[in-house]
Amino acid sequence: MAKFIMVVGTSSNSGKTVLVSGICRMLSNKGYKVAPFKSQNMSLNSRVSIEDGEIAVAQYTQAMAARSEPSVHFNPILLKPKGNFVSQVIVHGIPYEDRDYNEYRSKKDDFLDKIKQSINYLDKNYDYVVIEGAGSCCEINLLKDDIANLRVAEIAGADAILVSDIDRGGVFASIYGTVQLLPENWRNLLKGFVINKFRGNIDVLKDGFEKIEELTKIPVIGTILYDETLILPEEDSQALEGKRVFGNVKSPIEVNIVKFSKIANFTDVDPLSSDCLMKYIDFNDDITGDILILPGTRCSTVEMDLMKKHGLDKKILEFVENGGIVLGICGGYQTLGKMLIDEDFSEGDIGTISGLGLFDMETTFGNEKAIKNSTGTISIFDQNFNVTGYELHEGHSVSNETPLISLSRGFGNCGDSYDGSFKIIGNSYIFGTYFHGILENFEFRNYLVNFVRHKKNLSKIENDNYAEIFNENMDKLSKLVEESLDLSKIIK
């Protein structure tokens, strides 16, 4: 039987996701078989599990931290917002149906049964299960229908830790208010408080620790210092609010990423950030980079319509005329074609719309969703690159261009043996693919960066290995968590 631990928060962005990752890596380093778990997550950022099912990217990342194969049981319910208060409901990795909040709530007991199935599976197959809550664990207007927080701890028999972000201010009031508003049976599950993102001398907090422990009879088990050197994947698009420039600010290579209105899987671009200056651009902005990335999106037709309305489509075509490099990923790839055909309005209110026309390609929506871990070979250069990625798309594309990838596993453009498209227009190279994670492939990423460096008469570089950087930072996070928290009463 597994030991269950739960991390809940006083608010969204309190540090639950990162703390779970750190605990998972810490336990893995001690030789335990560890699983992360989040009963219900709402996110447009998702990845593909070992079973070819869809789970939130946060639980995938936590699985990597735990050194465990990512499973649909790590995130049994995934909600992907579609707009107008409707979300696509993913159950155990498979699209279930679209529901608004009231429709979803009416089936709460059915979804809770699925959550219990996953808890039972994890209990039998792991030594430790580290559960992440959602948002605030005490939204009193939602408590009776909350299947993502302390109800889950109660079902699993988990000891719970309450984390709060001191960087926002009001940390002790947030902790005390949360505890007081919780029903007694859930309050009794709390075994300790964690203060997150503290800057300065911890001694100034001692009076606060003593008072909050006196009032609640629950100890503060640690304070995590704010560490700006940690490089960790972001969980969802909220992290992009106000984010404009990141990556290697001293790099002579600039990458522009179109900040789509319904951007998804934006972490696809992260592997470039160690060697390139990364900059998000809005629909009204000029393109100033050497490489332009059109990322994934929940609604390709909506993004295409917005690009036309704001004139970004013309700027992209001008960028190509001037020899720029373009990479479209999933929804971004679809916009590079001639037509996006959505006769059933499955993508939204736009329907059928013409694309950028850089590829001789048509994409049709309304088909069954492709959810695959995929592999293949890129053979368009003077050498072959073996690549891996994952597919999450409902549109099927028929392209008359040179395929980017010859598939050995996957769905690709339309269920044939190929994925993506490649085209040279003058001095411009245009790449398109359904492979999320394409830039995690070292050889392809290295070729792309050095191709730009060659065009700018710069010497070649060997990129950092993205997987190595991830593991180095997870080990650093694990050490920070272990040194900051007293988990002796929870981890036995």
Swiss-Prot record:
MF-aspect GO terms: ABC-type vitamin B12 transporter activity; catalytic activity
Pathway noted in the entry: Cofactor biosynthesis; adenosylcobalamin biosynthesis
Q: Which InterPro entries does the record associate with it?
A: Class_I_gatase-like, CobQ/CobB/MinD/ParA_Nub-bd_dom, CobQ_GATase1, CobQ_N, CobQ_synth, GATase_3, P-loop_NTPase
List the keywords (alphabetical).
Cobalamin biosynthesis, Glutamine amidotransferase
Could you tell me the Gene Ontology terms of the biological process aspect for this record?
Answer: cobalamin biosynthetic process
Q: Which residues form the active site?
A: C330, H436
By its UniProt entry, which SUPFAM superfamilies does this protein fall under? Answer: Class I glutamine amidotransferase-like (SSF52317), P-loop containing nucleoside triphosphate hydrolases (SSF52540)
Superkingdom to which the source organism belongs: Archaea
Q: Name one Pfam family in it.
A: CbiA
Q: Where is the GATase cobBQ-type domain?
A: 252-444
What family classification does the UniProt entry report for this protein? Belongs to the CobB/CobQ family. CobQ subfamily.
Against HAMAP family, the record matches this protein to: CobQ
Q: What is the annotated role of this protein in its UniProt record?
A: Catalyzes amidations at positions B, D, E, and G on adenosylcobyrinic A,C-diamide. NH(2) groups are provided by glutamine, and one molecule of ATP is hydrogenolyzed for each amidation.
Q: What is this protein called?
A: Probable cobyric acid synthase
Which taxonomic lineage is given here? Answer: Archaea, Methanobacteriati, Methanobacteriota, Methanomada group, Methanococci
Q: What's the encoding gene here?
A: cobQ
